[in-house]
Regions:
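Two-component/phosphorelay signaling modules centered on CheY-like receiver
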Residues: 12-29, 118
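Conserved acidic segment of CheY-like receiver
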Residues: 2-13, 18, 49
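Short hydrophobic/Thr-rich beta-strand motif most characteristic of the beta2 strand and flanking loop
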Residues: 26-34, 40
């Protein structure tokens, strides 16, 4: 369990669900706001970040955090979590460095498959 995942989502329910899916194989750290996500990323240096697009600070807070992470850590692996499956938003995230995305609602197998693609 040496690989670390940062789960950044304002929903405690979503963080709990993702933690339950992934904590058997990976170390999990969490953040409930964009600011906390930035702080946790700097402190914990996760191998992969699962980042919600819409956070309490604003509709595109996750995109702002993605940009900050990418500027400070080129090559950081960030998978966006979105309830907004719009092509324009997804393209914007990929342009800013997101390696992938998961659309809510998602199932357990989709999460595992996506994470394993980047962490094994």
């Amino acid at each position: 369990m040496d690989k670390k995942i940062l789960i950044a989502d304002d929903s405690l329910f979503m963080r709990t669900m993702l933690r339950d899916i992934l904590s058997d194989k990976y170390k999990i750290v969490e953040a409930g706001t964009g600011l906390k996500a930035e702080q946790q990323f700097k402190k914990e240096k996760p191998d992969l970040t699962l980042l919600d697009i819409i956070m309490p600070e604003g509709e595109e807070e996750g995109i702002r955090v993605l940009q900050k992470i990418g500027e400070a850590n080129p090559g950081a692996r960030v998978v966006m979590i979105t309830a907004v499956g719009q092509d324009a938003v997804i393209k914007k995230c990929k342009k800013l460095g997101a390696v992938d995305y998961i659309v809510k609602p998602f199932d357990r197998e989709e999460v595992i498959k996506t994470v394993q693609k980047y962490l094994g």
